[in-house]
Swiss-Prot record:
HAMAP family found in the cross-reference section: GMP_synthase
Protein's recorded name: GMP synthase [glutamine-hydrolyzing]
Function, in words: Catalyzes the synthesis of GMP from XMP.
Reactions listed under catalytic activity: XMP + L-glutamine + ATP + H2O = GMP + L-glutamate + AMP + diphosphate + 2 H(+)
Enzyme class, spelled out: ligase
Domain of life of the native organism: Bacteria
Organism, scientific name: Pseudomonas syringae pv. syringae (strain B728a)
Residue intervals of the Glutamine amidotransferase type-1 domain: 9-207
GO cellular component terms attached to this protein's record: cytosol
E.C. numbers: 6.3.5.2
Pathway note: Purine metabolism; GMP biosynthesis; GMP from XMP (L-Gln route): step 1/1
Assembly mode: Homodimer.
Entry GO MF terms: ATP binding; GMP synthase activity
Length: 525
């Protein structure tokens, strides 16, 4: 019988914290499957899920306010360990008979907590040991309320001067709470604390590994698809590339990919996609060269949102035209990943299993009547990348910087023209090439060039010329929700600027974007 990699599982209940998905990613990194559900998950669904442990995540509410969210009683009836983090600790304390109150001194940012009690959760885990033998942890706090009275059978685990109950434990039941956030990297021992809870206290086995995920996904696809044929829109991005590699391994020639070349791709990207999948891996790929159709449809349009819609509609038209030429297609494959599923389920719905379809490809003709296959829908982006490596995709493809769906169409400000796209492609290629040479490509989260439809005077030899302006953009970010501009070395910027101006006729000036997000967005349009 095949190994069930979902057998040992953790349930995470979301109370609205910005860090909740990070908890799930940390649990997966430990090697254990987990799912994220709204705090008001149905009691029957909780029992059916049958977790080996439950994590109550943080949230922005105050436990002592009316109508603030509560943990379902079914969680405490399961008889499994429970770990409350921040708000999760507070609601657990209040629901089990303790008390929570607003704190005069709020704690946001770094803090040191003293470990003052023995417990299975924290024993042997520390950042400091004082001369008097007191253990200390460097942690990240983000709270305005605090537990003021322990529930029955709990003891104090950790404290700070302003938060005497910064951690609590009931070892007999395996119930623990901490006021700090072990899931963020600022809490230095956070990984060890979560690992202690998941592996030792809950007794989970680390079954969730890239090799086992690949085996399981291949088996699931074969079981779902059988001998039917599958269609995939291949973009060259990480998600669709991993889906293509996975499906090819699972069902071989039953897979057909349609690669739409819209004329707004990076330099040589179309050739690279065809070389990787069609030539090296033997995947059936139909390349639709639709540059002229896209550029004609975009002619005269300068509004960013309208450009996006035109590109999206044209993609659907081209994809539909190609897919209608194919016979006996029963399934449409999509690169839906777990964050898409979480967002679709919606907080406070209590019905996380009722997920709307993600039409990554768009409105396919109803007469095709295709069923969906979404082999990545349980995976976070970092897991998708690791799966890609496991399936044999090259590191540089799997860890390539994000590229917007509309491609260069939103990196050319204003109207999109072939001349602009050709200049931008070459400038972007030089920037990325120099980042790689200087070992900066993987130090930044995203880097690209933006074409600005304004001309600036330049000097070439003894003459003056008016030519176009481009901007370099490089950012550092963890989640792409906020980002800071990357402080690239001046020498590197000088090299990039010199090459672009000297090698590309038609560009006379290079600028560097030093805007962070917020207030600026990462992309210019």
């Amino acid at each position: 019988m095949a190994l069930d990699i979902h057998a040992h599982r953790i349930l995470i209940l979301d109370f609205g914290s910005q860090y909740t998905q990070l908890i799930a990613r940390r649990v997966r990194e430990i090697g254990v499957y987990c799912e994220l559900h709204p705090f008001d998950m149905d009691d029957e669904a909780i029992r059916e899920f049958a977790p080996k442990g439950v994590v109550l995540a943080g949230g922005p509410e105050s436990v002592h306010e009316a109508d603030s969210p509560r943990c379902p009683q079914a969680v405490f009836d399961l008889g499994v360990p429970v770990f409350g983090i921040c708000y999760g600790m507070q609601t657990m304390a209040e629901q089990l008979g303790g008390k929570v109150a607003g704190s005069e001194l709020r704690e946001f940012g770094y803090a040191r907590v003293d470990v003052v009690g023995k417990s299975r959760l924290l024993d042997g885990i520390e950042d400091h040991i004082d001369a008097d033998g007191l253990f200390g942890l460097d942690v990240w706090m983000s709270h305005g309320d605090k537990v003021t009275k322990l529930p029955e059978n709990f003891h104090i685990l950790a404290s700070t001067p302003s938060c005497p109950i910064a951690g609590m434990a009931d070892d007999a039941r395996g119930y623990y709470g901490v006021q700090f956030h072990p899931e963020v990297t600022h809490t230095k021992q956070g990984g060890r604390i979560l690992s202690r809870f998941i592996l030792d206290i809950c007794g989970c086995e680390a079954l969730w590994t890239p090799s086992k995920i690949a085996e399981d996904a291949i088996a699931q696809v074969r079981a779902q698809v059988g001998t039917d044929n599958v269609l995939l829109g291949l973009s060259g991005g990480v998600d669709s590339s991993v889906v293509a590699a996975l499906l090819h391994k699972a069902i071989g020639d039953q897979l057909t990919c349609v690669f739409v070349d819209n004329g707004l791709l990076r330099l040589h990207e179309g050739e690279q996609v065809m070389a990787m999948f069609a030539e090296n891996m033997g995947v059936k790929v139909i390349r639709a060269n639709a540059e002229e159709q896209f550029l004609n449809n975009l002619a005269g349009e300068s509004d960013p949102e309208k450009k996006r819609k035109i590109i999206g509609r044209t993609f659907i038209d081209v994809f539909d035209a190609e897919s209608c030429k194919l016979d006996n297609i029963k399934y449409l494959a999509q690169g839906t990943i777990y964050p898409d599923v979480i967002e679709s389920a919606g907080a406070k719905s209590g019905k996380a299993h009722v997920i709307k379809s993600h039409h990554n490809v768009g409105g396919l003709p109803e007469e095709m009547n295709l069923k969906l296959v979404e082999p990545l829908r349980e995976l976070f982006k970092d897991e998708v990348r690791r799966l890609g490596l496991e399936l044999g995709l090259p590191y540089d493809m799997v860890y390539r910087h994000p590229f917007p769906g509309p491609g260069l169409g939103v990196r050319i400000l204003g109207e999109v023209k072939k001349e602009y796209a050709d200049l931008l492609r070459r400038a972007d290629h030089i920037f990325i090439e120099e980042l790689r040479k200087a070992d900066w490509y993987h130090k930044v989260s995203q880097a690209f060039v933006v074409f600005q439809p304004v001309k600036s005077v330049g000097v070439v030899g003894d003459g003056r010329r008016y030519a176009w302006v481009v901007a370099l953009r490089a950012v550092e970010t963890i989640d792409f929700m906020t980002a800071r501009w990357a402080h690239l070395p001046y020498e590197l910027l000088e090299t990039v600027s010199g090459r672009i101006i000297n090698e590309i006729e038609g560009i006379s000036r290079v600028t560097y974007d030093v805007s962070s997000k917020p207030p600026a967005t990462i992309e210019w349009e």
